[in-house]
Swiss-Prot record:
Gene: rpmB
Pfam families given in the database record: Ribosomal_L28
Gene3D superfamilies: Ribosomal protein L28/L24
Cysteines paired by S-S bonds: none
Assigned protein family: Belongs to the bacterial ribosomal protein bL28 family.
GO terms (BP aspect): translation
Superkingdom assignment: Bacteria
Protein name, per record: Large ribosomal subunit protein bL28
Length: 78
């Protein structure tokens, strides 16, 4: 399973680790992904999703159905 948020599509970022002597080495900054079982009220069922914690905060604020609709995601296919 790839490390990608199923709702937002957030993935790893390429960055640099810089030491005190300014030696730079490549580093991957992974997204904070969590496997969650979320209740979808409109579909009247549970949905398992791998989402970022940022997406979880937005789901708590807006709700799963409206948030997925704003992103153009059909939850019935998941």
């Amino acid at each position: 399973m790839s490390r990608v948020c199923q709702l937002t599509g957030t993935r790893a970022n390429n960055g640099m680790a810089v030491s005190h002597s300014h030696i730079r080495t490549k580093k991957l900054q992974q997204a904070n992904l969590q496997q969650r079982r979320l209740w979808w009220a409109e579909g009247n069922r549970w949905i398992k999703l791998r989402v970022t914690t940022r997406a979880l905060k937005t789901i708590q604020k807006k709700g799963l159905g409206p948030y997925a609709k704003s992103l153009g995601i059909n939850l019935a296919k998941l």
